[in-house]
Amino acid sequence: EIEEINGNIWTSSTVRGFSTLLAEFLYKFLGHMSQGKYVPNEAFNAPEEFILGLLNGYFSGDGSVNGNTISATSVSEILLIGIQHLCSKIGVFCTLQKVQPSIKFPNAFMQHVLRINGHWSKIFASKVKMIENKKQLKLNKIVEKSKVKRHINYDTQENVVLDPILSI
């Protein structure tokens, strides 16, 4: 389906399946509705190859690459916390931020943004290969051009990020 939004042309695809068994499996394994999505527990103990494939699929579909920043936005905070945990398993530090919905959409859910910046975007780009070609080309540029050796906002000690504790 091709549509124009704010002067931009967007292409979207829809996949429909008619299997009660598959629907029940996906509902139990991945959650229901946008705000109910999550990373299944099995993914956290999976081999790195599986984790890289899951991150590839998620960011190829719902992520974006702009400059040296890789990001994803969701109304499901628990989904992005799971993605953040999977990224940490491959040595990539991510930040999470809550974003209030626009006043134009008073019934919209709170949005959550996961960002990978600094040298962690280079680590991510060197490990995760995207199936979406345009995003992969942008990741290749991060690997080729990024000279960042550490994150300017966070100190590290060995492989531990020393981010501030905001509350307990």
Feature-to-residue mapping (PLM):
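Internal intein/HINT superfamily modules and their associated LAGLIDADG
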Residues: E1-I168
